[in-house]
């Protein structure tokens, strides 16, 4: 009885079930390929037919929004947007929680003023950059008209994206205009963005735009967006409100999605400006603490910052990146040692931030430093002493192994 029961199969073999199953979609891959081909076709500049399609879609969407608004009681309604990782605990935290562990007192601010340029260059706001771009574009168009004839945008395209700019100037949440979503696929995307007047965007619009461009632009293009649009807006917001808007805080976190573009277009230009305030450095450094960044991009950024003229922002950003405990190349370690050794002949009072940064570096990479470099750092400690931090730095240097010696420095000197 059991033998008969074993010979009967209740189900067909799995391979036959897969082959014979007619419910499996076999044309999904071709649909995806066709969709990709359609996306690639948008890379060309807009012609008149495409401009009419965009204008029609934008008008339909605007009409739908107007109808829905008229049915309401006049109160703006926020529409929830699906998110990928915003539901995590660290994303729900307020921006102030990220940089609460950075403590800066008045003595640090006084000491850092000695390292600030006597007459810093006037910082350009986002509106200044937009006006400069517009003037440059007018000059370029005038030269093209005199040489090869007019090559301006279609007036319908300009009208559409001016309307998009009006939507973004009051955007809070929900769907972005369809005409705005195709901007990353346009060759003249930068010119189109300036038509929407980014200086008038809301903070929520800036976050949505950063999220869109970080996902769809190439690294060099994203770098330009971070440098020309996002960075000036963040600095303007901090300067005006003494804190960072939550949507801009999230925009910076999304910008780190492309770490190479973020460092080249946002963080390094901020350090090179020479007028980065401690408040800006603390806020942005707090965001870096929470994010995971690839070691290659962080190493290149540390190498560049170590070679820059000193500022308080440099100490904060170096400390944050050093505290991530990367396995750094020896070239980066040597550059950081040279960065600190430059102060051996500098008799100005150094802020506590500098001593804290040196302590973190020695704690994390004491065994990657040569014995000669350790002696050079000990010479620096004789010139610049902090009553609480310097003894700890000296102990870490003396009681640890070196890159070129297995024996601690204090035993080898006996």
Swiss-Prot record:
<comment type="function">
    <text>Required for processing of 20S pre-rRNA precursor and biogenesis of 40S ribosomal subunits.</text>
</comment>
<protein>
    <recommendedName>
        <fullName>Bystin</fullName>
    </recommendedName>
</protein>
<comment type="similarity">
    <text>Belongs to the bystin family.</text>
</comment>
<feature type="compositionally biased region" description="Basic residues">
    <location>
        <begin position="1"/>
        <end position="11"/>
    </location>
</feature>
<dbReference type="GO" id="GO:0030688">
    <property type="term" value="C:preribosome, small subunit precursor"/>
</dbReference>
<feature type="compositionally biased region" description="Basic residues">
    <location>
        <begin position="25"/>
        <end position="34"/>
    </location>
</feature>
<dbReference type="GO" id="GO:0005737">
    <property type="term" value="C:cytoplasm"/>
</dbReference>
<keyword id="KW-0690">Ribosome biogenesis</keyword>
<dbReference type="InterPro" id="IPR007955">
    <property type="entry name" value="Bystin"/>
</dbReference>
<dbReference type="GO" id="GO:0005730">
    <property type="term" value="C:nucleolus"/>
</dbReference>
<feature type="compositionally biased region" description="Basic and acidic residues">
    <location>
        <begin position="12"/>
        <end position="24"/>
    </location>
</feature>
<keyword id="KW-0539">Nucleus</keyword>
<dbReference type="Pfam" id="PF05291">
    <property type="entry name" value="Bystin"/>
</dbReference>
<dbReference type="GO" id="GO:0006364">
    <property type="term" value="P:rRNA processing"/>
</dbReference>
<dbReference type="GO" id="GO:0030515">
    <property type="term" value="F:snoRNA binding"/>
</dbReference>
<feature type="region of interest" description="Disordered">
    <location>
        <begin position="1"/>
        <end position="91"/>
    </location>
</feature>
């Amino acid at each position: 009885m059991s033998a008969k029961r074993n010979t009967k199969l209740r189900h067909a073999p799995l391979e036959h079930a897969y082959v014979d199953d007619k419910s499996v979609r076999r044309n999904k891959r071709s649909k995806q390929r066709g969709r990709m081909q359609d996306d690639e076709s948008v890379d060309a500049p807009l012609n008149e037919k495409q401009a009419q399609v965009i204008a029609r879609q934008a008008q339909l969407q605007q009409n739908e929004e107007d109808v829905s608004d008229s049915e309401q009681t006049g109160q703006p309604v926020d529409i929830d947007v699906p998110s990928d990782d915003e539901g995590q605990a660290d994303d729900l935290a307020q921006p102030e929680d990220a940089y609460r562990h950075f403590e800066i007192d008045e003595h640090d601010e006084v000491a850092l003023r000695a390292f600030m340029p006597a007459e810093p260059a006037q910082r350009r706001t986002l509106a200044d950059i937009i006006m400069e771009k517009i003037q440059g574009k007018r000059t370029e168009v005038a030269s093209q008209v005199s040489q090869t004839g007019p090559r301006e945008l279609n007036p319908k395209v300009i009208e559409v994206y001016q309307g998009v700019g009006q939507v973004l100037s009051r955007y809070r949440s929900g769907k972005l205009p369809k005409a705005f979503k195709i901007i990353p696929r346009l060759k003249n995307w930068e010119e189109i963005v300036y038509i929407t007047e980014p200086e008038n965007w809301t903070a929520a619009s800036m976050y949505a735009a950063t999220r869109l461009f970080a996902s769809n632009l190439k690294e060099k293009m994203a770098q330009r967006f971070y440098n020309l649009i996002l960075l000036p807006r963040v600095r303007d917001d901090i300067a005006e409100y003494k804190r960072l808007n939550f949507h801009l805080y999230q925009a910076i976190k999304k910008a780190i999605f492309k770490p190479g573009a973020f460092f080249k277009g946002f963080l390094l230009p901020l350090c090179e400006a020479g007028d980065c305030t401690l408040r800006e450095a603390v806020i942005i450094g707090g965001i870096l603490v929470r994010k995971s960044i690839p070691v290659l991009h962080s190493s290149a950024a540390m190498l560049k910052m170590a070679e820059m003229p000193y500022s308080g922002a440099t100490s904060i950003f170096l400390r944050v990146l050093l505290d991530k405990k990367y396995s750094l190349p020896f070239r980066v370690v040597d550059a950081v040692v040279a960065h600190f050794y430059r102060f051996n002949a500098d008799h100005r009072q150094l802020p506590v931030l500098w001593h804290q940064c040196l302590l973190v570096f020695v704690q994390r990479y004491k065994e990657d430093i040569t014995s000669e470099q350790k002696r050079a750092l000990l010479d620096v400690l004789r010139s610049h002493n902090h009553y609480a931090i310097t003894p700890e730095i000296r102990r870490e240097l003396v009681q640890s192994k070196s890159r070129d010696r297995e024996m601690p420095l204090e035993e080898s000197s006996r």
